[in-house]
Amino acid sequence: MTKKRHLHCAAQKVLNNGGCGGIDGVEVEEFRENYTKNMSALYRQLTEDRYEPQPVLRTYISKGNGEQRPLGIPVIKDRIAQQAVKQILEIHFEEIFCDCSYGFRPNRSTEDAIKKVEEYKEQGYNWVLDADVKSYFDTIDHEILMELIAEEVSDGWILDIIRSWLTIGVMTEQGKRRNNGGNSTRRRNFSTFSKYLPTSL
């Protein structure tokens, strides 16, 4: 599979998921209308080491208890790049993730998690712990996160681009920008992508 084919596979997943546009105002349908042009531009940016992510759009949704949950909406081209990297990393990380983990994993669903709970119940387990880490994604230590990823991923380009997404910051709907901090890093050419590419999907 070529790098370009891999990027197109990522694009189809992102576009099929729909969702709102980011700070550039480009919606999914608009991106589709100029698909060839947009994808060619993104591919060149990545392969020519010119890719720069844009700040995510900060918006809020109701949690149902009177509080609001912050969301960060990347622009579509950044979502596609993120999906492409995700598809590469998943190949390795799926082999080491805990079997009891079901959240945001391929070929695993809420129904699968419920089935596992039922199995535990039949084995005599009667207690359930309902826990949540408050503001987890807003407060996670990026340096610790990157150290953990680096234990499994040695490629500098992959690590650099993940760090750039973590530190690019957010833009509010009022046009105010807030940075997440972090150190700037040197990105490496997209050609290193090829060593991670699957032979099939």
Question: What annotation goes with each model-predicted range?
Answer:
Residues 20, 30-55:
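Amphipathic alpha-helical blocks
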Residues 78:
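Short loop/hinge segments at the start of secondary-structure elements
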Residues 85:
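Nucleotide/phosphate-binding loop and acidic/charged catalytic motifs
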Residues 1-36:
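Non-catalytic, polymerase-adjacent accessory regions of viral genome-replication enzymes
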Residues 45-60, 64, 96-108, 112-201:
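Conserved polymerase palm-domain catalytic core
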